[in-house]
């Protein structure tokens, strides 16, 4: 059942399982947490922000028989929000005035993408039976949040 939920999420078909909004995840919670975080480490700790509200919402709306579906749904929504934040941060770093090592940043980001994929595949493989998809989803979310925090730390001070 977990694999079915993960496949639905990957195919973008999770929305019909929940009434209304697919997740209840509020991407603004990420911006609020990042704005309040004074250090790179504190920003990376924002990875799980918004999950409690999302889970409460998803559990109230989901009527299926897979107990892991609300968690998978919220992890996916959280990861997608972090991915959007990372992309915006990366694009800003590439276009920042005075940013000369753009090719180095591009290479680093490509290497990081491969690292994240391999790390999260390892998390999937190492997880207890039936928990691999959730472990991989959590890994994707957490690593994307960490990378966002790292790129934010590289921004020049205003």
Language model features with spans:
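Bacterial N-terminal signal peptides that target proteins for export
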Residues: 1-7
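Sequence termini and other peripheral, non-core segments
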Residues: 8-12
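N-terminal signal peptide c-region/cleavage motif recognized by signal peptidases
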Residues: 14-16
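N-terminal alpha-helical modules
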Residues: 19-158
